Structure formats: structure tokens, C-alpha cells
């Protein structure tokens, strides 16, 4: 899925990714494995619960903990935890994936990489359920058991029967593993939210631990309920298949079949399956939480490297290169932190190069921040145009904000994309620490699609399934280039229906070129098909876009823009007293112009019909949903950044060159009327 990157660039990206994240990943995996014996001990204690003989209960539990078979299964569980941790590393994302329609959500779930993720987790869930069943002992330990009523099968010899209790355990573990994988992508659990307040790793883990255990127990309860319903209707299929394949009998004299109501009302079985699910989810969530804590910990990027060989990791070069997304997020987070709390590092930003006397550090940092903010402005303008005209944003071409060039841009001049793409499928496009990604040629667009059929492409092109901007297009509005998921012929037809002035107007007569009769007939048929399908409730149920999801998708990567705002505004405010060379004053008009233009775009955006003016109340949950309110945090950060600059410089800003509209808006900030 990753775009083709040259070998040296990919190698440098992998090197910096390993230097920054390598030890964090190893530490999170080690702690996940070290915490596994504690979880296993709790599981053994509760699996042998005996309230009437507490001393005997505890002594037997701890004696079993040191037995050879428990140690063996503990090693096997450690391998499972390592595999789960590797998948956490491979599938993380710093930009959440927000499908804007139900069909896009289905496409996200059935993507080949997601299917592989689900299959592996189902297998690992079955392995953990097998280990839990054996550790529990009793009637759940083995899949094959001797038949008690051997004579009933017509032979006095000993017969082997299928232990349906053990099969129930294995299938429940597989379903729990698959459900974990499904919710992992549906709830954006692969999204890495960066903490607003920096805390010690132990404090963050301790704060999440109680919520983690509670969430695991409740989720296991619901999964057991769902599995019982599923086993009641379909349980006979795996039971008959395994018994036939292994030539096993089904002894109904020992216990009732579990695919009946009376068989499923076995409270002991339900309790142990629920406990197994809670154990599985707790250990997997612990590894997931530890990876999130370690990966989002702040990292210090030096502004000026002490040695020449360390220049690849200095902050200006990281920001202006094309690093992996998480490295760029960590760099912007570091910019936000030191701009507030480190005067010595701020002095390095304001310093001049020797020899030459050029402000390379400030130029590189401010240029990247302004490029990010200009990119957000253009994105909001495109969204407003699409919403105002009921049209469609051109998703086929990435938005390239205008680059800021200056004479000082010689040191850190590297080709790059100034705006990170916002994928619609989970952002798996990152440099892997372990292996290269399995790529599929179908997913090339920034918004991506898991479908390759031309028929589905044309169908999706009619309803614009995966595009998060705009709404279904009216017949009179055909604009802004080809739709998503269109074939080459469709693109040519769209280009023909959108003639540019240079091609549609002749140089002599300035007359419009009329479309052919065949093309008009095709267009009419397409509109008739579109109107026919739009009246079908089931089709519109899958193709209609959710307004809230479309709005969230616009601000899905707003976290790095928030850090760019805060870092840039704090540096500008600090320059009033700390900038001895006046390097900030040369770019202050451009900074104010960018911030005020962005403020105007944000104000217009929040006046749109579907844009709520108040953030929704988000209840405390293990799964982070802060990305749903990023637009409100971005609006507050933008206004705070402008006020931070105006309160620091005061009336001195009246001497800054700006347009009349910006001067008026700046005066409102100076008078605290915004």
C-alpha cells in the first residue's frame, strides 16, 4: 500500500524510526511479557475459586502455579503476547481512519490486511483459550476423552469421545480474538492519541489499569452472550465436522449437548468461559496500552546537532524532510513543549549560522509550520465550496499548499510533501521496523478503496461512497475533475464534461463546443440509473454519507496543526524579549496573515449547517475518542495563539503590513472583542 520510495530515503526513514521508537517497542513488549505471570496467577486463583475452603483454595492455586505444565503454557502465552505486540506495532496510526459511509466501513473491515489481522487474532485467541482450558483442569482440559458408555456403541472396547466443553472453549477463544480484531479497526483502537499533559509512564499505566480490567470483564460478558447465541444455531456444524474428521463419538450420557438451551445453562461452563475471555482481553489490552504509552512519550530532537553525523535527527531537518508520520508528530510535539518551557532551546532557534549569519533554524521551523497551516486553510476552503454548491471536492488531486520560499532556505532545502495525506483506510503506510508491508495495487488514492471491480467502481462513483466531502451530486453540477473509483474512460468523459476555457472556447469565434448526441444519451442514462438507485432504501443505507463523520474526517490530522500553532505562537511571543537578532520580525507579517486567514476559514466552517458549535460530551472509556472533538480543540488553539501574539506585542502590531480586512480583525483581537 505504501507509495514507492527510493532506497536511500526509505533507509533513512527506517533508521530514524528505529532510533526513536526501537527501544520503546522493545520495552513495551518486555513489560507485557513480565506482567503476564501476574495475570496468569489471578486467572488461576479465580478459576479454582472455593469460598468454603479458602486456605485450601489458595494453597492449591499457588502450588499449581509452579508446576511444570503451567510454566510451559506460560511460555506459550508469552509467544502469543509477543505476536500480538508485533501486530500493534505494525498497525498503529497517528491519523484516525474515519469512514464516511457504511459501505466505506465495510470496505475497511474486509481489506486484505485487516482480514489477515483478524485471522491471526482468531488463531491466537484459540491458542490462549486452549492454554486457559488446560490450566483450568477438570472437564475442560482435553478435546478427546474416554467414553463412559462404551458398550452403548456396540463394542466392549474403550471408545474415544469428543469433549464438547473443550471445543466450546476453543471456539469461544477464536470468536473473542476475531471480535477484538474487528473492534480494533471499527473503534480506531490503532489510533495513537498523544497525551495533553505529560506524565510518567507508570502513572499513565496505573490510571488506565482499573478501566482496562473493567472494560475487559464487561466486554467478555457480552462476547460470551453473543457466542452462546451463535453456538446455539451453528454449534452442530463444527461439532459434527471434528467428530467425523477425528472419528470421535459424541457421548450425550455425560452431559447434555451444548447447542441446546439446557446445555447452555451450565453456569460453571459460562463462568469459566467468561473468565477465559477476561484473561485474554486483559493481557491483550495491557500490551496495547503499554505500546501506546511508550510510543507517545515525548522525544527531544536537538535543534542544533552537536556533531555533524547527528544532523539527520535535528528538529529543523526532521520537520522539513518526509519522515514517518509518527516521527513528524513527535517532532511537532517537541516543538510545542520546548517553545513553552525551554529558553535555552528557544535561543538555538533564534540564533544565526556561523559563518554566514543566516537564521536557518527559524526559517526551517517557521516555514514548515506555515505550510501546515496553509494546507489546513485550503482544505477548509475546499470543504466550504463543496458544501455551499452541493458539489464535490476534487479528491483525485492532493492539496498542495503554497510553499514559502526565502533566501535563507538553502541549508534545509529537501523535496517533501507539505501536508501529510489523510487516508480513509487505516494508515498502514509507514516504515515498518520488522518487515515491508504487504501492498495491494488497488489502494493508491489518498482515500483508498478495497474494491477492484470496475462495476463497483462505477457504482461507487455515482454515489461517491468513500469521499468525505460533499453530498450526492446533482445533474447540473459536474465539477472539479474525476470522481473516486472511476475507470479511465469515466475520467475522460468527466474531463470532456468539464472543458477548460482554453479547450472549450475557440480562439477565433469563442464558441462553446457542444457535446455529442451519444455522450448526452449516456449522461441521461447515468442520471436515470442514479435516480432509480437513490430511491432504493437499502442502497442508500450503505451509500449515504454521515455528516458528522465527514466533518471529523476534515480535522482527522488536526493534532499536528494544533502543535504547529502552539509552537509557532509561543516562539513568536518569546521573541519579543529573547530574539536578539530580530529573525522573527522578518516573518511576522506572513505569520499573522496565515493565522488570520485560517481564523476566517474556521469561522466560516463553523457556520455551516452540519458543523456543531459545541463539542459533544465524551464519557470516560478505554477506547480513545478524542479525535471526534479535534475541530473544537483546533479552533480554541487558533484563537489562543492569535491572542498570545497580540497580547505580547500590543500596539506594535499596528506597524505590521497587512490588508485592511486583517488590520480590522487584528484590532478586534487587540481590543479583546473576538
From Swiss-Prot:
Record-listed Phosphoserine modification sites: 406, 439, 445, 471, 474
InterPro entries: Nucleoporin_prot_Ndc1/Nup
Keyword terms: Membrane, mRNA transport, Nuclear pore complex, Nucleus, Phosphoprotein, Protein transport, Translocation, Transmembrane, Transmembrane helix, Transport
Membrane topology designation: Multi-pass membrane protein
Compartment(s) of residence: Nucleus, Nuclear pore complex; Nucleus membrane
Spans through the membrane: 25-45, 69-89, 115-135, 166-186, 226-246, 273-293
Region (Disordered) residue spans: 394-425
Positions in the Perinuclear space compartment: 46-68, 136-165, 247-272
GO molecular function: protein-macromolecule adaptor activity
Topology, Cytoplasmic side: 1-24, 90-114, 187-225, 294-674
Processing after translation: Phosphorylated.
Ranges of biased composition (kind: Polar residues): 407-421
PANTHER family: NUCLEOPORIN NDC1
Function: Component of the nuclear pore complex (NPC), which plays a key role in de novo assembly and insertion of NPC in the nuclear envelope. Required for NPC and nuclear envelope assembly, possibly by forming a link between the nuclear envelope membrane and soluble nucleoporins, thereby anchoring the NPC in the membrane.
UniProt record similarity statement: Belongs to the NDC1 family.
Protein name: Nucleoporin NDC1
Organism per entry: Pongo abelii
Gene it is expressed from: NDC1
Amino acid at each position: 500500500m505504501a507509495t514507492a520510495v527510493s532506497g536511500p530515503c526509505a533507509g533513512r526513514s527506517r533508521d530514524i524510526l528505529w532510533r526513536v521508537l526501537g527501544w520503546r517497542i522493545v520495552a513495551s513488549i518486555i513489560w507485557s511479557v513480565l506482567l503476564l505471570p501476574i495475570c496468569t496467577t489471578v486467572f488461576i486463583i479465580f478459576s479454582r475459586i472455593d469460598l468454603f475452603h479458602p486456605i485450601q483454595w489458595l494453597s492449591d492455586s499457588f502450588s499449581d502455579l509452579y508446576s511444570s505444565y503451567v510454566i510451559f503454557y506460560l511460555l506459550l502465552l508469552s509467544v502469543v503476547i509477543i505476536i500480538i505486540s508485533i501486530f500493534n506495532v505494525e498497525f498503529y496510526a497517528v491519523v484516525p481512519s474515519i469512514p464516511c459511509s457504511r459501505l466505506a466501513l465495510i470496505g475497511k473491515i474486509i481489506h486484505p490486511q485487516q482480514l489477515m489481522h483478524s485471522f491471526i487474532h482468531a488463531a491466537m485467541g484459540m491458542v490462549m483459550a486452549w492454554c486457559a482450558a488446560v490450566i483450568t483442569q477438570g472437564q475442560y482440559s482435553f478435546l478427546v476423552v474416554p467414553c463412559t458408555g462404551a458398550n452403548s456403541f456396540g463394542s466392549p472396547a474403550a471408545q474415544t469421545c469428543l469433549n464438547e466443553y473443550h471445543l466450546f472453549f476453543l471456539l469461544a477463544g477464536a470468536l473473542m480474538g476475531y471480535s477484538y480484531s474487528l473492534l480494533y479497526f471499527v473503534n480506531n483502537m490503532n489510533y495513537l492519541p498523544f497525551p495533553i499533559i505529560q506524565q510518567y509512564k507508570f502513572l499513565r499505566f496505573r490510571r488506565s489499569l482499573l478501566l482496562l480490567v473493567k472494560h475487559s470483564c464487561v466486554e467478555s460478558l457480552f462476547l460470551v452472550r453473543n457466542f452462546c447465541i451463535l453456538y446455539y444455531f451453528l454449534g452442530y456444524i463444527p461439532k459434527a465436522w471434528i467428530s467425523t474428521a477425528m472419528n470421535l463419538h459424541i457421548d450425550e450420557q455425560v452431559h447434555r449437548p451444548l447447542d441446546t438451551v439446557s446445555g447452555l445453562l451450565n453456569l460453571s461452563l459460562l463462568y469459566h468461559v467468561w473468565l477465559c475471555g477476561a484473561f485474554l482481553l486483559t493481557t491483550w489490552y495491557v500490551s496495547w496500552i503499554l505500546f501506546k504509552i511508550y510510543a507517545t512519550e515525548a522525544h527531544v530532537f536537538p535543534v542544533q546537532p552537536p556533531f555533524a553525523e547527528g544532523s539527520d535527527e535535528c528538529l529543523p531537518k526532521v520537520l522539513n524532510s518526509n519522515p514517518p508520520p509518527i516521527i513528524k508528530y513527535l517532532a511537532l510535539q517537541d516543538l510545542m513543549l520546548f517553545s513553552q518551557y525551554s529558553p535555552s532551546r528557544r535561543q538555538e532557534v533564534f540564533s544565526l549560522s556561523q559563518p554566514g549569519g543566516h537564521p536557518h533554524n527559524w526559517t526551517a521551523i517557521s516555514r514548515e509550520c506555515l505550510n501546515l497551516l496553509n494546507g489546513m486553510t485550503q482544505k477548509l476552503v475546499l470543504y466550504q465550496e463543496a458544501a455551499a454548491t452541493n458539489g464535490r471536492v476534487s479528491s483525485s488531486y492532493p492539496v498542495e499548499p503554497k510553499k514559502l520560499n526565502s533566501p535563507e532556505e538553502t541549508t534545509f532545502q529537501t523535496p517533501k510533501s507539505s501536508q501529510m495525506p489523510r487516508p480513509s483506510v487505516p494508515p498502514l503506510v509507514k516504515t515498518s521496523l520488522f518487515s515491508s508491508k504487504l501492498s495491494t495495487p488497488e489502494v493508491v488514492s489518498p482515500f483508498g478503496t478495497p474494491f477492484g471491480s470496475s462495476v463497483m467502481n462505477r457504482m461507487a462513483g455515482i454515489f461517491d461512497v468513500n469521499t468525505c466531502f460533499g453530498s450526492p451530486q446533482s445533474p447540473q453540477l459536474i465539477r472539479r475533475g474525476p470522481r473516486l473509483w472511476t475507470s479511465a474512460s469515466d475520467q475522460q468523459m468527466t474531463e470532456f464534461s468539464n472543458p477548460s476555457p482554453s479547450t472549450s472556447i475557440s480562439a477565433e469565434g469563442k464558441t462553446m463546443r457542444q457535446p455529442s448526441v451519444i455522450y448526452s444519451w449516456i449522461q441521461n442514462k447515468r442520471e436515470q440509473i442514479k435516480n432509480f438507485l437513490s430511491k432504493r432504501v437499502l442502497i442508500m443505507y450503505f451509500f449515504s454519507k454521515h455528516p458528522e463523520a465527514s466533518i471529523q474526517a476534515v480535522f482527522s490530522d488536526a493534532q499536528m496543526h494544533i502543535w504547529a500553532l502552539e509552537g509557532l505562537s509561543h516562539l513568536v511571543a518569546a521573541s519579543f524579549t529573547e530574539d536578539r537578532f530580530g529573525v522573527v520580525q522578518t516573518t511576522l507579517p506572513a505569520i499573522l496573515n496565515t493565522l488570520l486567514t485560517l481564523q476566517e476559514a474556521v469561522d466560516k466552517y463553523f457556520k455551516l449547517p452540519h458543523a456543531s458549535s459545541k463539542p459533544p460530551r465524551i464519557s470516560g472509556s478505554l477506547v480513545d475518542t478524542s479525535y471526534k472533538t479535534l475541530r473544537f480543540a483546533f479552533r480554541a488553539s487558533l484563537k489562543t495563539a492569535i491572542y498570545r501574539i497580540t497580547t505580547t506585542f500590543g500596539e506594535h502590531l499596528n506597524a505590521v503590513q497587512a490588508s485592511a480586512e486583517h488590520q480590522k480583525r487584528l484590532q478586534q483581537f487587540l481590543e479583546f472583542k473576538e
